[in-house]
């Protein structure tokens, strides 16, 4: 409301200073982000910083040529306080009472310069991450909403970024100014990521939005059209191929084919591309799209937890995560409703008797265990009736399971339906088929109250908004943290009259059942380090209830006793990844798929870290190929372990080592014995021109600083740091050689010849892993 006037004052050269407090969390981070975004460095924005005294004044100072005024009173900077609320304010003029004015102004000056801290990007980000919406904010929001509704009555709706969207837009623009060409927004369901991408796309003419379901594309098209009403838009799905539009909404299935991409588009067809649910980006069809197009900016959107289900997607986006807000933070900030979670012991199924293959229980065995289980059906129905929801979702393991539950509930007097893909429905037989509903029809009936519960199979995990859902039931093992949080997120959106979401989790003795407390609290990194009792005292989001059956707590304790720790946990995780991939994993593959808690343990315990001696680790497990066993005790293993263990305060050594791995002239079975200045310079510049990697280079505070560096500057950096340190490391593997910048010692010639391409592949794998490890750590520390 005040922003237009502040911007006008700024244009006139008026200095603007604001001193605010973080007392009781009344100051909203998004408001501060908006000020910084719109007014930039021309506003001096500060926090009161005396923790021993409360800060509660409201005063507004205005200075003119001949007079200054201060308004003192009860109005803070909020719509209701400045318009419709009952507030008392007093205006004091320096002309009328100079002594009193000077006293107030001197007090402000003292507070501003002596008892405050500047709100830098770092300070603001830290405040936003820890901010919890105060209880009084609910009343304030009600007043604001009423005032806004009165103002907007009869007016056309305006679409403007709100709340955390403002924060995300600020961070996205900041990252682009730093040179980023890609980025992931990792945000819990409910913040409006699609609208966020629409706002962020405004500076770009042609936009591509990619998703895996047509329903998501329709919702996205509506959002973009609301934000960009003058732009043409169309779809690239099924029989719709409207490629020549400003805003194109395309399904992965229709777009992710090489022949289609080459026939219909060029690599620069779009300036801005959005990949919805970007955790799918590693799939083949997504990869084809990413490989083909070269936009000015690529934005990935996801609500999933990055630390538990693989990291490869982050590599595709240069480990750039400009903005993230976890589910816990979103609930704390009032973006999502709180949840009342009930962990219910389901001992009607013995999961230990079922086969667990490649990270999942066999679907057919799960289905069989559920279909003829009257005791379980009654247990689920009993708890459902206890909490009497109006709009519920039940997540099932298969189409047969979903149909069975819909039939059982319907016959028990609860209007129910089943939702799964049409392909599955064609195979369904018997009268249970009668309970199947088309996805769109099902949502309408659930929203209207015509049916009370929908039982679904992988249909509502992501990308579908049904805000009215007030109860979700987990009716199958949720082995994947991604799936667990996606299912939870289906019911956390705010809706009129909805105060919280009820969650019924029917848990049994299945693998990782004891992960639930960590996922609900956001403390997943502590999974392998904590005890069962600690897990039950974790800090959950504000106003949330988490209640586990006593029998379930006993189960968690038993699982804790059997939980693998230390070396056993690392070995078990290695075998899990090997089973998942169906081959011995490379270092990069193990890093990509390793459980984050196990990985953190490896980083803390160097002796247990397989990445520091991966050949010997595999040898100890009997997983090393016969020809590679001959490397043990030779320079081959010593050289690899040197690269695996070399310290990396910065990333300087990696582009130098990458120069040895480049497949051009002079290599011996894929590796060079020596590299020239031009070899290293080419590798170095390519590496640091990627994304925001330039930040590592000495004396570079901005992307422009890096771009202005000469080859001489780069070579000075290269020679002084990585080349010098490599020559001093290990058993003298790196040496001087006439005509080259750096070389391998002569004895390595035999190693390269005898080791062949397999040795070269191991070395390249190490270098790639060390790069990924470095940037993952940088992202994690920043987060």
Regions found by a protein language model. Give the residues of each.
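Walker A/P-loop
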Residues: 177-200
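Conserved strand-helix element at the start of the C-terminal RecA-like helicase core
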Residues: 207-210, 214-216, 368-410
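Conserved helicase ATPase core of P-loop NTP-dependent helicases/translocases
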Residues: 218, 235-236, 241-242, 260, ...
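Post-DEXD/H (motif II) to motif III coupling segment of the RecA-like Helicase ATP-binding lobe
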Residues: 280-341
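Conserved segment of the helicase C-terminal RecA-like domain
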Residues: 481-483, 490-524
């Amino acid at each position: 409301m005040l922003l237009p006037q502040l911007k006008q004052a700024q244009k006139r050269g008026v200095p603007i200073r604001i001193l605010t407090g973080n007392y009781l969390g009344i100051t909203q981070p998004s408001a501060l982000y908006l000020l910084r975004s719109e007014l930039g460095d021309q506003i001096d924005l500060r926090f009161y910083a005396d923790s021993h005294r409360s800060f509660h004044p409201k005063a507004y100072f205005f200075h003119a040529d001949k007079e200054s005024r201060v308004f003192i009173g009860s109005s803070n900077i909020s719509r209701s306080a400045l318009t419709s609320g009952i507030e008392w304010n007093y205006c004091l003029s320096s002309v009328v009472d100079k002594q009193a004015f000077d006293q107030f102004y001197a007090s402000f000056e003292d507070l501003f310069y002596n008892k405050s801290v500047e709100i830098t990007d770092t300070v603001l980000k830290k405040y936003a991450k820890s901010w919890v919406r105060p209880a009084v904010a609910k009343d304030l929001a009600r007043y604001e909403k009423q005032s806004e509704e009165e103002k907007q009555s009869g007016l056309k709706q305006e679409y403007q970024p709100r709340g955390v969207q403002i924060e995300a837009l600020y961070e996205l623009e900041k990252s682009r100014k730093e040179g980023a060409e890609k980025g992931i927004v990792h945000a819990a369901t409910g913040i409006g990521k699609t609208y966020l991408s629409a706002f962020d796309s405004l500076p770009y003419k042609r936009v591509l939005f990619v998703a895996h379901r047509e329903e998501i594309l329709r919702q996205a098209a509506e959002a973009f059209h609301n934000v960009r009403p003058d732009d043409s838009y169309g779809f690239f799905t099924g029989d719709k191929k409207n490629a020549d539009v400003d805003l194109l909404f395309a399904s992965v299935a229709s777009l992710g084919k090489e022949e289609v991409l080459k026939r219909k588009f060029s690599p620069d067809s779009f300036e801005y591309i959005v990949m919805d649910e970007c955790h799918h980006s590693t799939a083949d069809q997504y990869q084809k799209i990413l490989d083909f197009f070269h936009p000015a900016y690529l934005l990935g959107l996801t609500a999933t937890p990055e630390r538990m289900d693989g990291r490869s997607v982050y590599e595709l986006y240069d480990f750039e995560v400009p903005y993230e807000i976890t589910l816990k933070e979103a609930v704390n900030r009032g973006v999502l409703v709180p949840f009342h979670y009930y962990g219910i012991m389901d001992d009607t199924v013995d999961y230990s008797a079922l086969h667990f293959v490649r990270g999942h229980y066999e679907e057919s065995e799960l289905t069989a265990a559920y279909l003829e289980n009257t005791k379980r059906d009654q247990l689920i129905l009993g708890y459902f009736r206890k909490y009497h929801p109006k709009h519920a979702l039940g997540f099932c393991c298969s189409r047969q399971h979903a149909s069975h539950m819909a039939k059982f509930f319907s016959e028990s007097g609860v209007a129910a339906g089943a939702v799964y893909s049409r392909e599955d429905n064609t195979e369904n037989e018997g009268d249970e088929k009668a309970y199947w509903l088309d996805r769109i029809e099902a949502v309408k009936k659930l929203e209207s109250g015509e049916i009370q519960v929908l039982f679904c199979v992988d249909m509502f995990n992501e990308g579908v908004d049904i805000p009215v859902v007030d109860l979700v039931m987990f009716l199958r093992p949720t082995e994947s943290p991604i799936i667990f949080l996606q299912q939870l997120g289906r019911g956390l959106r705010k809706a009129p009259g909805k105060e919280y979401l009820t969650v019924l989790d029917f848990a049994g003795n299945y693998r990782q059942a004891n992960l639930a407390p960590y996922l609900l609290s956001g403390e997943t990194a502590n999974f392998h380090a904590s005890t069962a009792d600690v897990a039950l005292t974790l800090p959950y989001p504000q106003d949330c209830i988490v209640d586990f059956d006593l029998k379930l707590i006993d189960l968690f304790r038993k699982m804790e006793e059997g939980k693998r720790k230390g070396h056993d946990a690392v070995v078990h995780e290695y075998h899990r990844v090997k089973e998942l991939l169906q081959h011995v994993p490379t270092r990069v593959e193990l890093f990509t798929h390793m459980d984050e808690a196990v990985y953190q343990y490896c980083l803390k315990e160097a002796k247990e870290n397989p990445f520091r001696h991966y050949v010997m680790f595999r040898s100890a497990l009997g997983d090393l190929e016969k020809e590679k066993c001959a490397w043990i005790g030779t320079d081959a293993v010593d050289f690899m372990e040197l690269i695996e263990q070399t310290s990396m305060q910065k990333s300087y050594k990696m582009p130098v080592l990458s120069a040895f791995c480049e497949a051009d002239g002079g290599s011996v079975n894929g590796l060079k014995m020596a590299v020239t200045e031009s070899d290293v310079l080419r590798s170095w510049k390519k590496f640091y021109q990627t994304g925001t990697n330039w930040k590592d280079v000495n004396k570079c505070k901005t992307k422009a600083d890096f771009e202005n560096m000469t080859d001489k500057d780069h070579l000075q950096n290269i020679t002084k740091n990585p080349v010098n340190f490599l020559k001093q490391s290990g058993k003298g593997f790196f040496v001087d050689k006439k005509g080259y910048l750096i070389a391998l010692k002569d004895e390595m010639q035999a190693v390269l010849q005898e080791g062949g391409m397999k040795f070269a592949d191991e070395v390249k794998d190490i270098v790639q892993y060390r790069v990924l490890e470095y940037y993952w750590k940088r992202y994690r520390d920043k987060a």
